[in-house]
Amino acid sequence: MAPTAPAKKRKQSAEVTELSDDEIIDGLLDGALSQSEDDSDFVASGDEDEEDEDEDEDEDKDEDDEHDDKQDIGDLQDLSLNDLDDDAQSKELAKDGANGGSGDGPEADDEDRPNYRVVEDANGGIRYVYDEINPVYDSDDSDKEEDNRIGDIPLSFYEAYPHVGYTIDGKKLMRPSERRQALDSLLDSIEIPKGWTGLTDPTTGKPLNLSQDELELLKRVQMNEIPEEGYDPYPDTVEYFTGIEEKMPLSAAPEPKRRFIPSKHEAKRVMKLVRAIREGRIQPYKSKEEREKEEEGKEEKYYDVWQDEQPRDPHVMHIPAPKLAPPGYDMSYNPPPEYLPTKAEREEWEKMDPEDREKEYLPQKFDALRKVPGYETFVKERFERCLDLYLAPRVRKNRLNIDPASLLPKLPRPEELKPFPTVCQAIFRGHEGRVRSSAIDPTGLWLATGGDDGYVRIWLINPARQVWAVKLSSDEAVNAVRWRPTKDTMILAAAAGEEIFLMVPPDIDPEVEQTSRAVLDAGFGHAAGGADKQTTDGKAPAAKWARPGARLEDEGVLVKVTVRSPVKVISWHRRGDHFCTVSPSGQRSSVAVHTLSKHLSQIPFRKLSGLAQVAHFHPSRPLFFVATQRTIRCYDLQRLELVKVVQPGARWISSFDIHPGGDNLIVGSYDRRLLWHDLDLSTRPYKTMRFHPQAIRAVKYHRGGLPLFADASDDGSLQIFHGKVVSDLMENATIVPLKSLKGHRVVDSLGVMDVDWHPSEPWCISAGADGTCRLWM
């Protein structure tokens, strides 16, 4: 289609004069490379005058071109002004534009017919509205589907509308008919068209077909051919480097002198800038705020009032004024509720005489700081302070200058208190789940452990290896294991749920094994003779003694004692004939004492003030200690009376142990405190130590004469202490923290569950929630 006349007119106004190559070089690029080192490479040093003449000629040409351009622009402006001034012509154009063409009639050619309409814009001027292009059938885009131009908006927004989006011109894209889609899908299933994929275009809702190019691409990929047509996967290599050595340079011309001397043109421009800076024509940039600040500084002058002041020493009797006390919580505009007075307190304060009031104000509460009113008595308070400073005499109080370090006790260095455990020597692995209890036998050769898997395992301490294991329960965990404290027998007591098992490991000395079995079997004859006597009162026995069964007897478990509630703690008497058990959930029967030689169980307390946690026998006297959640009670077993109540001050006692001397004990609590008690000194703790960020699970004294004790915490560490106790009642115990042993992992907020000492060496065993036991040396 040929362009119309108005289009030609616009094209003429927008045409730019074509320039030849010489004009481009001389005119457009003039100055781009002037005064540079690259142009000076091709110009001789003696031809500078000729270069200046050429530059003048180029400038004249540029001025002529600019003059011609300005003339053309002026003609266009005159033409547009004449068109706007001709009102009759504009109205006629608007009328013809509204009719859709010129006034030549149907005989006018399509080439001369304008492709626009003239309408009035919002300001009353002329606006040209061009008709939409109507491409012919042969056009490339005539068969192209209109794209949906809604962008990233989900199509779910258009589910309630008959259209699915808009074209680039803002026209609605109507949703295809469902009946037609069903018919098309039926026809496509009968005869598959070319490019059919079975998918639907989410933007238009129409079937998504492949083009011919895409089909060709898929065919090439299927035939294992190169997808892109005309691509050569093996192009000829270009030998950038050859094996021929070029000894001579391509150009041996010497470097010109101008490469090594400063440029004269740049020197001229630099000197021009230097002169401008010296004359003050070029000033550094300063912001508006800086300029205003300089102007204010010029107008105002400041003087030092104390310039001539001479420093003087303060008077001998000068006492500085006391400082005001800092404000408290009651002076806050939003104090805590406990600081606010009640209605009765407010009335009482108002009735009091102002001189009798403790405070001159009552605490008040406001929602925001902006709502706080002015302080009524502010001026009065400041006036009274001035009177106090001016009238009240001042007294200087001398403070004692004492070094705080001198108040601390002088403790020995940890290096001087060796031996004590410092490193992990061996790791005992075998339990599944937590290892809840561990114990070393009186000979110091064997280690017994019990865990959540229901197994009791016997280990050889050095070297670390397992020698025997027995499964006591499939449902309950083994909460406690303790050896009988005699060297002539090897009897181990273990608690799993409500059952207590007494066993003799088979892999020991045959004589010791025979003696141990005889001690356990002796009680069955005594129990058979006194069975009727124990049940004549009609009450149920405290515990039931029986054989555990053929399977357990073959493995070395000889006696099973069943109590009323799950057992958590087992503690032996020093002679080995009695042991006590603690069941925290047992209420009245939480503490029970068992006699091994008679197979007899007794409940010593009818009622306990609190839940029992731990119980121990005194190492040398007939005393029995029972710890509840907050107190430790000491009972005399001969006189059957309460002797002493120890008050550690802890919130929840987890464990305690008695010193071999019998006059001191240590207490561990779940509130992260380790407390040392001197029973001869007071019922209150002598020392309170906080070295763990988590709860303390177990504490233990060394039984072999070494002044050592340890605690185990849920933070996965053990703390080793030196605790020296002397027989002199005038001297207190010396407690020194020695070493923090870390090695266990914290699992489910549980770290080290139990700790025990070697009977003769400075070694300790720790049982952890990570399923391992560690030997520390």
UniProtKB/Swiss-Prot annotation:
Signal peptide: none annotated. It is found in: Nucleus, Nucleolus; Nucleus, Nucleoplasm. Residues 36-67 have a biased composition (Acidic residues). InterPro entries: BOP1/Erb1, BOP1_N_dom, WD40/YVTN_repeat-like_dom_sf, WD40_repeat_dom_sf, WD40_rpt. The keyword Nucleus applies. Disulfide bonds: none annotated. One of its GO terms (biological process) is maturation of LSU-rRNA from tricistronic rRNA transcript (SSU-rRNA, 5.8S rRNA, LSU-rRNA). Residues 1-122 are annotated as: Disordered. One of its GO terms (molecular function) is ribonucleoprotein complex binding. GO terms for cellular component: nucleoplasm; PeBoW complex; preribosome, large subunit precursor. Component of the NOP7 complex, composed of ERB1, NOP7 and YTM1. The complex is held together by ERB1, which interacts with NOP7 via its N-terminal domain and with YTM1 via a high-affinity interaction between the seven-bladed beta-propeller domains of the 2 proteins. The NOP7 complex associates with the 66S pre-ribosome. Belongs to the WD repeat BOP1/ERB1 family. Component of the NOP7 complex, which is required for maturation of the 25S and 5.8S ribosomal RNAs and formation of the 60S ribosome. PANTHER family: RIBOSOME BIOGENESIS PROTEIN BOP1, RIBOSOME BIOGENESIS PROTEIN BOP1 BLOCK OF PROLIFERATION 1 PROTEIN. HAMAP family: BOP1 (MF_03027). This is Ribosome biogenesis protein ERB1. The gene is ERB1.
